[in-house]
């Protein structure tokens, strides 16, 4: 029965991927958005069994200029905690790529990633947001929030383009959302966790220490970045596709003044948007959860269509079983780059690491990769168990997988 469900889920996933398409026309393709959405649907579950949480718009945001790209109000989904979790808060920052040109930001205004007019009115809470103890053993009864992403720069911008009526106000959205949640009871939090997936995982890194400053010293505050370890890596043509993309984001949204000053004193602003140059300087305890062969980075950073003009990587990046030995070695070099980048970070006793050798993305939001009977494991522990062990100081977690293809527990993504 389990295999039937997995096959059915895969068929649904492939169909939805084709239907959604991509943001093309030479701009940043929102593959991150697609993967995040599609992964949440991988487990075939009846809608009646899912916790559906309504959207709340932040009414006070408008007067502060804390608005989405198109000027609409930002929003979040909150499911209140209960029992022992009544004064515990988990904030999940939504992912969804970036816009790196005026044109791509204008397009983004017509989607839920740039306008609350297009956001779903209810969202399913699964994985780390689930309210079931058998699906989310450590955080199921916490106050759980999903903060919607509509600024295109991982909640960091504070400028605008008047001629195009674009509002780059991610930093203001962050502040406005935190003020609202504090007024909703988060100021009484005994424990708090800031998490995020993909572009939201990067945002969790960028805002981690700011999040800590919201609470008194008696509150336990930690951060989780899921699939947020975007690497300044060489692509298959020898160039730096992701650096070019990030440079566009930093320039278009004028992020220079919003980035870590400790970093920008030594490196250029674009380098200070890459987590590898930030994580070791974060003072708040943090957990890095990442697939060593991150599916989004394989698709859009290592072998994007713009540099694979011959299409020689198309089959390989769609399904790693179609890769030749030299292509696999290219991925192994990328894994080594990532592992080396977290070595200093991992030396801190307060930090946690879970890097599995899978072709995956956003493993905390999906139920089948977060906590399920056949979930991916490292050292005999699921992602959920590992994050819980780290957060509650049950044990240290420094789990780095052996290279592909040694891990047989992966839920790898395959594109058609």
Swiss-Prot record:
GO cellular component, one term: extracellular region
Sorted UniProt keywords: Cell wall, Cell wall biogenesis/degradation, Glycoprotein, Hydrolase, Secreted, Signal
InterPro entries per record: PAE/NOTUM
Effect of inactivating the gene: No visible phenotype under normal growth conditions.
Molecular-function annotations in GO: pectin acetylesterase activity
Role: Hydrolyzes acetyl esters in homogalacturonan regions of pectin. In type I primary cell wall, galacturonic acid residues of pectin can be acetylated at the O-2 and O-3 positions. Decreasing the degree of acetylation of pectin gels in vitro alters their physical properties.
Encoding gene (name): PAE3
EC number(s) per entry: 3.1.1.-
Residues linked to a glycan: 131, 324
Range of residues in the leader sequence: 1-25
Pfam families: PAE
Family: Belongs to the pectinacetylesterase family.
Catalytic machinery residues: 198 (charge relay system), 294 (charge relay system), 361 (charge relay system)
EC category name: hydrolase
Species assigned in the record: Arabidopsis thaliana
Identification of the protein by name: Pectin acetylesterase 3
Keyword Transferase: no
Keyword Cell wall biogenesis/degradation part of the UniProt annotation: yes
BP-aspect Gene Ontology terms: cell wall organization
Subcellular location: Secreted, Cell wall
